[in-house]
Amino acid sequence: MRLSLLVTLALTALIEAHTVMVYPGWRGNNLITNETFPYGMQWMYPCGGMGTSRNRTYWPTTGGAVSFQPGWFRGHLQAQLQINLGYGTDGPDGGPPNMSNIMVKPFMLLGPTNNPYPGTVCLPQVPLPAGANVSAGDRATIQVVEQAQHGASLYSCVDIIFAEPGDPRIPIVNETNCFNSTQFGFAQIYTVTTQEPSLDVIASTTTGSAPRYYSWAGWLPLVAGAIWMAL
């Protein structure tokens, strides 16, 4: 398992790949650029051009770990990350009908360089979406979204089957598949609220002193010129 992952990462480095999912699994290797995908597969919504996996991974009904490697492509000195969940198999190719259920709201990743870089991001306890009601045996898809600096997004997915916590079929989380590399920083995304201009302020700028100010401003160059000629 670890050997196959190392081989995948080596190939990734050669072809400037994108986001590699480490835990709980990966829908499949979509690190491909060819005539069919001239810009690369991972830019394609919802799962980077990969069809639904027939070999699903078990994941706890109470939420669990998600880890991935975000820096296998240029332009990710800063990136916006988000994790979503799609329920069921009623959508295209036996997958979810949509990926609109947010598990982790957008946050900023601060990378060490704008060139490709190694390193892992681990979220040890990703919660289920608000209002989620899942049972053991239900099927779903976890979607990791990485928005690059130029605005386009990369998509990677893992197809899961929910299982009760402690189920031996759930892959073990340990320090080799879920850790945060020290060269990464993180930041929250926030909004700035602007105040609507007051009508009183607008009125005060259209009457009274404002016209006189601009009137004097118009005369100032002429006055300055006259003083200079007198000297």
Swiss-Prot record:
InterPro entries: BIM1-like, BIM1-like_dom. Glycans are attached at residues 34, 55, 98, 133, 174, 180. One of its GO terms (cellular component) is plasma membrane. A lipid is attached at residue 202 (GPI-anchor amidated isoleucine). Residues 1-17 form the signal peptide. Its cofactor is Cu(2+). One of its GO terms (molecular function) is metal ion binding. This is Lytic polysaccharide monooxygenase-like protein X325.
